A protein has these predicted regions:
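Active-site beta-loop-alpha junctions enriched in small/polar residues
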Residues: 7-9, 37-39, 97-99, 118
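Glycine-rich anion/phosphate-binding loops
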Residues: 11-23, 75-76
Length: 138
């Protein structure tokens, strides 16, 4: 199975996200994976050093909250992205980063959850996702 990762490659534009799904199909993908989070559910708006991205990255000096706020896929896009993927014959699924994301994805009948590498120690999230869906990829 070939999975195309959407991540933040839409650059904040819904049209780009939709075209990315269609391009994934043209490129031979079988599925497209989103990331489902909001900045306010995965970090704090805080100016302490632990909340600033380290030197040496392209986001050097940026606050995590601000980066996540720019990079996330707006939740109001998810339904349309799932629909476009289905029209294209693709499986659409996501990495939920918290329980509220799982709940939103449940409403879209998301067929699988991919637990992000960064979240593999978040046992409450994994247990919650597993209580909703039997197919989870870690």
């Amino acid at each position: 199975m070939i999975v195309a990762e959407m991540s933040a490659n839409h650059n904040g534009k819904k049209e780009t996200a939709i075209e990315t799904v269609r391009a994934a199909k043209r490129a031979g993908a079988d599925a497209v994976k989103l990331q489902t989070y909001r900045a306010d559910t995965i970090t704090l708006r805080c100016d302490k050093p632990d909340f600033i991205i380290n030197e040496g990255s392209i986001w050097d000096g940026q606050y995590f909250y601000d980066l996540y706020e720019q990079a996330y896929t707006p939740w109001e896009w998810h339904e349309e992205l799932f629909h476009v993927a289905k029209e294209e014959g693709l499986i659409c699924f996501s990495s939920p980063f918290d329980k509220t994301a799982v709940d939103m994805l449940e409403a879209l009948d998301c067929p699988v959850y991919k637990i992000a590498s960064f979240e593999i120690t978040d046992i409450p999230l994994i247990e919650y996702a597993a209580s909703k869906l039997s197919l989870i990829h870690i």
